[in-house]
Structures are given as C-alpha cells and as structure tokens.
Amino acid sequence: MSAFTPASEVLLRHSDDFEQSRILFAGDLQDDLPARLDTATSRAHTQQFHHWQVLSRQMGDNARFSLVATADDVADCDTLIYYWPKNKPEAQFQLMNLLSLLPVGTDIFVVGENRSGVRSAEQMLADYAPLNKVDSARRCGLYFGRLEKQPVFDANKFWGEYSVDGLTVKTLPGVFSRDGLDVGSQLLLSTLTPHTKGKVLDVGCGAGVLSVAFARHSPKIRLTLCDVSAPAVEASRATLATNGVEGEVFASNVFSEVKGRFDMIISNPPFHDGMQTSLDAAQTLIRGAVRHLNSGGELRIVANAFLPYPDVLDETFGFHEVIAQTGRFKVYRAIMTRQAKKG
C-alpha cells in the first residue's frame, strides 16, 4: 500500500484544506493516505482486516477494525473522509453507522471512482448531509457536505438470509454472495465427499455456506473459518449458529492469524479487492497452504477458469488435479506430499 489510489490522488489536490482538521477516514481504504496526510489528527475505521493491518502499523490505536464503529472510534473528529466502496448496501451500512455517531456540523467528504457508483452518495445522504460535487479527476468524484441531522442506525436491520438445500445462510452488506449461493461455490460443494473427517479450514469463508453445507453431510469434521471482512466473520458466526454447526470463526488476512495444521483447506478465493483486480490473496493461499496442511492433507479451491492458478499450484505442490469444471469455473485439488515446498 505505497502507491495512492485514484481516489486518494483526488483528495491530495485538496490537501491544504485538511491540515487543521481532525479527520476520520473510513470506507474502502485501499492505501495508507490516512496515515500520511498532513492533518491535526487522523483516525481510521475499517471493516477489512488487511487494511487495518497496514494502517495500524503506522497509526497504532488510531486505526480500528470492527463491523460497527463506536463513539470511541470517532471521538474528537470534526471531518469524515469516506471512500466509497463498490457495494452500495455496504456504503449505506457504514455511512449510517458513522453519521449516527459524528456530531451535527461535521464536514463530510465522500470520494470514489465513478464506476463504483459514488454519485449515488448524493441521494443516500440527502436527508442527513446534502452533498455537492467539488472535484472531478482521475475518473473519480469528490463530494462535500455538512452533517445536518444524525440518522438512527440499527445494525440488526441490515441482516438478510437465504436458504440453500434446507440450510439458512445469514448475510450482511459487503459479504460475498449476499443474495444467494454463487455458481463457483456450488461447483466446489458438489465435489465434497460425505463422511469426511478431520480438521477443515475454510479460508475467505464469506457467509459460511461452504462450511455448513460440508458439515451437514460430514458432521465429524472440525471447522475453522476465517475472512478479512468483519461482516463476513459475523455472518459466518450467525450462519453456523443458526444451523447448529460448531466452528471457530475469526478475522485473518489469509493465514496471518491461523495457527496449526489441517487435513483440508477449502476456499473460493477472491480476485477483487474493492474495485481493483488482485490475485494476491489466492496466490498467498496456495503458497501458504503447505505450512498449514498435514501430510496427505488437501487444498481444494474453486476459481474462474481463466485465472493463472495452475502454475502456482504446480510450483508449490509439484502437481495439481482439476476435479470438476464448467465453462467458467474449475475446482483444483492439490495434495500435501514430499514434493510440496515447505514454504
């Protein structure tokens, strides 16, 4: 996170305006501008664990990671700089949360790429902080307003759910496949063998659907789930609880917080981080899996067929198999053998 995003470059055009401000940065924080911009004070709140990791190294306790921001997270701030995400319900959750805590009179800046739909911020905040566009550059828009009325925020109203083969999946804004089971996960599930035993790690667990579906026909597996997203962690916990499935769920940047080894690692790894395409997480998953698999253990992932994972799998494990495929997706399997690099 050294190079600035287009949204941050637009903000830097106005850097003089922020020197005396006590700023809260929030939203899709893809770089470390919150730690580097010259301000009176800077705080940051993010729902993304990997963004918090970067910012906390420079900002310490002034960078916070959680699903819901608290009054302590926004204390003494007189300005909000909000980076618009690609997901509108996610923006609504975060902005209603933050504006319910910030005092009336707070300066509100919203910045984002045009393709992310940032212009819809005007309508979303019309009743609370009417916005005007103050800059347009780098295919981004920058909007400014002042908080006139605090919204009432209730996180419980943002929960959703759907059913998959008799299982109830709990979801929140910002969670992958929020409105239903995606085709890739469906293909991966079709390959899982009933009556599997052992320790299973679900990396990038989303709403937890892979784990609960696996546990239904393999009740003796011991589940661990992790994700970078605070909404995903909470959704997975709720999905497990609703379906009576036990498992440990926590935030982790791929393997950063994972301890121990497993008999199987499953994943539908992301290849987007916000608006940006990124293969980093999946490549880290493949290369790091050898440090978290028991001998004979298995990595099983689903991915878009066009993504360049076979080479990384072969380089790391010595070989791989394609055990299911459609026109769009492939399910890859790699086994932990003596051929595998030990990382």
Swiss-Prot record:
Keyword rRNA processing: yes
Keyword match Transcription regulation: no
Catalytic activity annotation: guanosine(1207) in 16S rRNA + S-adenosyl-L-methionine = N(2)-methylguanosine(1207) in 16S rRNA + S-adenosyl-L-homocysteine + H(+)
GO MF annotation: an example: nucleic acid binding
Primary location group: cytoplasm
GO cellular component, one term: cytoplasm
First and last residue of the signal peptide: none
EC number: 2.1.1.172
Keywords, alphabetical: Cytoplasm, Methyltransferase, rRNA processing, S-adenosyl-L-methionine, Transferase
SUPFAM superfamilies according to UniProt: S-adenosyl-L-methionine-dependent methyltransferases
Protein localization: Cytoplasm
Pfam families for the chain: MTS, MTS_N
Protein family according to the UniProt entry: Belongs to the methyltransferase superfamily. RsmC family.
Function of the protein: Specifically methylates the guanine in position 1207 of 16S rRNA in the 30S particle.
Subunit comment: Monomer.
PANTHER family found in the cross-reference section: RIBOSOMAL RNA SMALL SUBUNIT METHYLTRANSFERASE C
The protein, known as: Ribosomal RNA small subunit methyltransferase C
